[in-house]
Design a protein with these regions (language model features):
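N-terminal secretory signal peptides that target proteins for export/translocation
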Residues: 1-4
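Bacterial N-terminal signal peptides
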Residues: 7-17
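Sec/Tat signal peptide C-region and signal peptidase I cleavage site
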Residues: 18-25
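Short, glycine-/small- and polar/acidic-enriched structural segments
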Residues: 26-157, 161-176, 180-186, 197-204, ...
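Short, solvent-exposed loop/beta-turn-alpha elements that line the ligand-binding surface or hinge
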Residues: 55, 206-211, 276-284
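Pocket-lining segment of extracytoplasmic ligand-binding domains
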Residues: 89, 168-258
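Secondary-structure end/capping motifs
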Residues: 226-302
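Conserved C-terminal helix/tail region of periplasmic/extracytoplasmic solute-binding proteins
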Residues: 295-319
């Protein structure tokens, strides 16, 4: 009996040691997350809270950024393995210039962002704005930049584009009159709309060419992807799992409302009215041909990428 106990204890120690080793050897991945708090970038925070990535042996260290420019630079420099929510146009332009990045997932197809004016603004719609007015976007090459360029190219907007950073900072600038037409991403701005302090000037999906485009993507540092591909694949397994959970478990909205410091009503309104699950599909990137034409027109690209370059650049789905 004593001998059996000794054997059992020995096995327990061995298994405990193995478990401890596995915990210690979880792959640590650094992420740069654009516009933290947006529904389409919240897979990182929410997934960490429910242990989705840990189940696949991945430990995340996330840094919030103000948008595409900061996110992309962190990945290019190698200070982040993955960038979340990068404007597709900006990513294409950077790759064409030799940046060591690869697209590893779609982040947002279509666009839930909307542009606002103060309630007392004389601007009622796109045709009312002149070259004396300003219109906000986050950073160069971002999805909001693509939208503003689309407003100008396809809807005839004449306002002057100006980079204003994230939605919270932009709302402050719009409410103080420092920019005429601001932008925001739901649920930020819902309360001001309900209180009658702002009006919707235009929606991103008003631009016909953008409705079916993947306007934001997730990118990886090319060297990190090459050296640690298995860890990247396991991260994506967790990422997909989180998206499924966000649309199937009522607790997801409660957790998001807590994370975003908003009401459950606003969280539900945002998801159900602005973000169909298909918009967050990580395993497709749509509209690349049109985006490359846009990139050439606005001088992000000298010429479209070749089919060979696209195959190297877009590694979706990552499995």
């Amino acid at each position: 009996m004593t001998r059996m106990r000794a054997v059992i204890v020995t096995f327990a120690v061995v298994f405990a040691s193995i478990a401890a080793d596995e915990a210690r050897t979880a792959d640590k991945m650094k992420l740069a997350v654009g516009q933290c708090g947006n529904w389409d970038s919240s897979q990182i925070e929410l997934g960490t809270r429910i242990g989705a990535y840990a189940r696949y042996g991945v430990e995340l260290e996330a840094l919030c950024t103000q948008g595409t420019g900061e996110t992309q630079q962190a990945v290019i420099a190698g200070s982040a393995d993955i960038g979340i929510g990068v404007g597709t146009l900006g990513a294409i332009g950077a790759f064409a210039k030799g940046a060591p990045i690869r697209i590893v997932a779609g982040s947002a197809t279509g666009n839930a962002d909307f542009w606002i004016v103060k309630a007392d603004s004389p601007l009622k719609g796109v045709n009312d704005a002149t070259s004396a007015h300003t219109v906000a976007y986050s950073t160069n090459g971002s999805s909001t930049h693509s939208v503003v360029l689309g407003f100008i190219r396809e809807l005839g907007l004449k306002a002057k584009p100006i980079a204003t950073g994230g939605p919270a900072a932009t709302l402050t600038l719009a409410m103080s009159g420092q920019v005429d037409i601001g932008w925001t991403s739901p649920p930020l701005g819902f309360d001001l709309l309900d209180e009658g302090k702002i009006r919707i000037f235009a929606r991103a999906n008003d631009v016909p060419s953008l409705r079916g485009q993947t306007v934001r993507v997730n990118i990886a540092n090319a060297e990190s992807l090459k050296a640690r591909r298995d860890a990247h694949v396991r991260f994506m397994q967790g990422f997909r799992e989180v998206i499924d959970w966000m649309y199937s478990d009522p607790k997801a909205l409660d957790m998001y409302a807590d994370y975003r410091k908003t009401s459950l009503r606003n969280a539900a309104r945002m998801r159900d009215e602005f973000f169909a699950k298909s918009a967050l599909d990580p395993d497709s990137v749509k509209g690349m041909d049109a985006l490359m034409v846009e990139g050439v027109n606005f001088k992000y690209l000298a010429k479209p990428l070749t089919p060979e370059e696209l195959r190297e650049f877009v590694q979706v789905p990552l499995r």
